[in-house]
């Protein structure tokens, strides 16, 4: 963070990006930049939109010593829960994700990079499952036969989403794809 950007008592969150999972760090950060900038045009509640802090040269992340880093403004009076303390915690996290999805209904999804190729391609995942079952490299398949049979019995349904996308019956939309409790900041006071 450049000294001209430093404000007294301004706090930050510095995150190391897992580039083993997200191999296209530039694409990931372009996605985050595009989505957060778009969200700012859709809501007056700017506290609900992450603020990415740029590097001195205007980049959205830093690559140094084989590691990738990004910085966000710290959201004051917020909490991040690993486990729910009440049913309301789950409800409010669902409200957060629902609001996120609703605000992005008209975002041009085709502009986003696929940061983990085929991660949500169910037929591709199914093929990988079959290949792994055939090899059974850890010799554990016998221990999970009911689960394997459950998946195998649903082969016909595995292509439903990909087919609907390809036919145009299902529009391409932005989704969060990691909707878990600790990916939502909750208001610490309410």
Feature map (PLM): residue ranges:
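ATP-binding pocket architecture of kinase catalytic cores
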Residues: 11-31, 37-111
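Structured loop/turn residues at beta-strand edges in well-structured enzyme cores
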Residues: 1, 47, 170
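Active-site beta-strand-loop-beta-strand hairpin of nuclease catalytic cores
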Residues: 8-11, 188-190
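Short, small-residue-biased leader/transition segments that mark boundaries at the very start
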Residues: 1-7
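Hydrophobic HxD+1 residue recognition
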Residues: 179
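ATP-dependent phospho-/nucleotidyl transfer catalytic cores
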Residues: 15, 22-26, 75-95, 106-176, ...
